[in-house]
A protein has these predicted regions:
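Formylglycine-dependent sulfatase
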Residues: 1-179
Length: 179
């Protein structure tokens, strides 16, 4: 981080996650890249991407986490891609979790309901993504610069934190947001 950059006034170009990701990866405004709101299933067909430009400049390019790429396994310049699909496959192989899925907590994907996650913290998607990112950092090629895009689903509905965090805040009054 000594040679890194902090953006203290960075703002999303769009409040919708898919459109914002497209703008970040293409450098284009939502209007220019063709998505100004939430639209699933719209193909990503761009000649240039941030990851592709960095890869072509010699960077190791790795994405871990949520992508919203279409088709889902599209690399868009990333040499390595680890997604929610990989997490789902990993979760299905965990001992004692036959048939358990990440949404078995019963809260729909974009619901405003909240309840504790049914999985132990070490098996929750965000924990798994973090572990995968740390594994990359610990085993990457130290002779090459890198670009790691680590993208979590949370905070995003459904609101299903680990039990310990749910219990920590459930009965607490929250201050009004500063505007």
């Amino acid at each position: 981080s000594r040679g890194g950059t902090t953006f203290t006034r960075a703002y999303t170009p769009c409040p919708s996650c898919i459109a914002a990701r497209r703008s970040l990866m293409t450098g284009m405004t939502p209007y220019s890249q063709g998505m100004i709101g939430y639209q699933d299933g719209k193909p990503w067909d761009y000649e240039h991407t941030l990851a592709g430009t960095l890869r072509d400049s010699g960077y190791q390019t790795v994405n871990v986490g949520k992508t919203h790429f279409d088709p889902p396994r599209l690399h868009l310049g990333f040499e390595q891609l680890t997604t929610s699909q990989d997490y789902g496959e990993w979760l299905a192989r965990q001992q004692g979790l036959d048939g358990v899925e990440k949404f078995a907590h019963g809260v729909p994907a974009n619901s405003w309901l909240a309840r504790p996650n049914h999985l132990p913290e070490h098996q929750i998607e965000e924990t798994w993504f973090t572990t995968q990112a740390l594994d990359f950092l610990n085993h990457r090629d130290p002779t090459r610069p890198f670009f790691l895009c680590l993208s979590f689903n949370g905070p995003h509905p459904p609101w299903c934190p680990p039990q310990v965090f749910y219990d920590q805040f459930i009965d607490r009054s929250m201050p009004e947001p500063a505007v």
